Swiss-Prot record:
Alphabetical list of Pfam families matching this protein: ATP-synt_ab, ATP-synt_ab_C, ATP-synt_ab_N
Primary location: membrane
Name recorded for this polypeptide: ATP synthase subunit alpha
The organism of origin for this protein: Neisseria meningitidis serogroup C / serotype 2a (strain ATCC 700532 / DSM 15464 / FAM18)
Gene Ontology molecular function: ADP binding; ATP binding; proton-transporting ATP synthase activity, rotational mechanism
Functional description taken from the UniProt entry: Produces ATP from ADP in the presence of a proton gradient across the membrane. The alpha chain is a regulatory subunit.
Membrane topology: Peripheral membrane protein
Residue positions binding ATP: G169, D170, R171, Q172, T173, G174, K175, T176
Recorded name of the encoding gene: atpA
PROSITE patterns (alphabetical): ATPASE_ALPHA_BETA (PS00152)
NCBIfam families: atpA, PRK13343.1
Alphabetically ordered keywords of this record: ATP synthesis, ATP-binding, Cell inner membrane, Cell membrane, CF(1), Hydrogen ion transport, Ion transport, Membrane, Nucleotide-binding, Translocase, Transport
Family statement: Belongs to the ATPase alpha/beta chains family.
Amino acid sequence: MQLNPAEISDLIKAKIENLSVNAEVRTRGTVVSVTDGIVRIHGLSDAMQGEMLEFPGNTFGLAMNLERDSVGAVVLGEYEHIKEGDTVTCTGRILEVPVGRELVGRVVDALGRPIDGKGPINTTLTAPIEKIAPGVIARKSVDQPMQTGLKAIDSMVPVGRGQRELIIGDRQTGKTAVALDAIVNQKGTGVICIYVAIGQKASSIANVVRKLEEHGAMEHTIVVAATASEAAALQYIAPYSGCTMGEFFRDRGEDALIVYDDLSKQAVAYRQISLLLRRPPGREAYPGDVFYLHSRLLERAARVNEHEVEKLTNGEVKGKTGSLTALPIIETQAGDVSAFVPTNVISITDGQIFLETDLFNAGIRPAINAGISVSRVGGAAQTKVIKKLGGGIRLALAQYRELAAFSQFASDLDEATRKQLEHGEVVTELMKQKQFSTLNTAEMALTLWAINNGSYSDVPVAKALAFESEFLSFVRTQHPEVLEAVNASGAMSDESEKTLEAAMKSFKSSYAYQA
C-alpha cells in the first residue's frame, strides 16, 4: 500500500483540525498567613470578589478582600491543616449549592451537604448563592394569603405570598414557635418551606427537626443548619444558600416560604469575618455594608409574574406566578428595637410582628403586641372572610389597652366602659393559641364571627378558650358543610351566618356549654 504525499498532508491536517486540547489556565497563589479562619494569599492577581478558592485537602474558601498585593479569603470549614506556603488555586466559579426537589425532607449544611444520616442527595442541579433580586418589571403585587394558622397574625397582621414579614423580640418570647407554626400550617397547600438555622445549638436544631417530623411538616420542608460550633463563614452564607434553594421553586411558578432563624446571629458572624479581614468598623463595630448584607438577601423574597416564570423556565411553565415569602427573625436585647441591626431589617421588610417578654410571661402566647405590629402589604392578600370579620379585633384590643391603663386610676366605671373592658379581656384571651394547634380559614372565621356578634358576652374570661374549642367541635360534627363552604369560597354567606346563629343558640343551651 502506497500513500502519496498529498494524502499524508491531508491526514495530518484532518488530525490537527480534530485535535481537542483541554488546557485549563488557573491562577495559583501562596498562603502568606492563616489566623482564625482568615487566609492571606499572595499571587492571585485575577481573583474575583466572592470567588471560590481551592486549598489543599479539598477545602474551599471565599475571596472577600481584594487588595493590591494580596487576597483576604475566608475558609469554609476547618482550617487547621492549612499552613504558610501552601498553594491556593482560583476555581473561576462563584460558590454554588445543590437545588431541587430532592432536598425536600432533608437536613443540609450551609453548602447543601446532607447531615441527617439519610444518605446522599441525588440532585444534579446547582445554583449560585448570590443572585440579583427580581426587578420591578418581573414582580407582581402581593394579593394571595400565606396563612400562618395563628388567629392573632392572620386577623391583625396578615402575611401575603411574596411578602417579607419580620418576627422581632427578645430571647425566649416564642419567635421560633411562631415561624414553626407557619411552616406546619403549609401542610397540604403545596407550599415548600425552608427553615434556615443560623448559629443555634445543634440540640435546638435537632429538636426543631423532631417537632416538624412529628407534625408531618418535614414532607414539605428543607432544613439548612449552620450551628454555633461551625465556622463564622458558614453561618454567614447559610441564609443565601437557603434562599437559593427557595428561588428554585419560585422561579418554576410555585410558592415557597423561608424562615431565617435568626439574622442577628448572621450579622454577628459577618462582623467577626469583617473585623478579622481588617475592614473598618462602624456603628456597634459592624462593617459599613451590614445593611446591604440583609437587603440583598431579603429583596430576593418576592412574587414574580407569569412572564418572568415563563422566561426562567424557557416556556415550560405558562400562566403561573411564583413566590418566595420570607419570615426573618431578629433577636433584640432588652426590647431595644432602635439598635443597628433591628432598625435596618425593620426598614427592609414589609412589616413586623413584635413579640414582648411581658405578654409572654403573662401567659399571652403568641406574645404579639398588636399595637406596634404591622403588615404593610398583607391587607391586600387577606382572605375576604377574615378581612371582614377581623377588622374590629385590632380596634377592640387598642381601645381595651387604652381603657385598661385609665381604669387603674378610676374607682367607678360606667356601664359602657366596663363592657368594653370585658370585651377586650375576652378578645385578648381568644387571641391565645397553643403551639402546633393552627386553625384553617373556616375555623378562624368561626371564632372571629362569634367575637363580633357578641356570643362571648355571657362567657367568663377563664372559660373563653374552652368555649371556643367546644363550639368548634360542635360545628365540626353538626354543621361540617358550613366550614367546607367557607374554606372553599373564602367568604361567609348569609345562609351560613343563619346556620351558625342557630348552632350557637343550640350549643349554649346544651350540656357541653353548661359543663
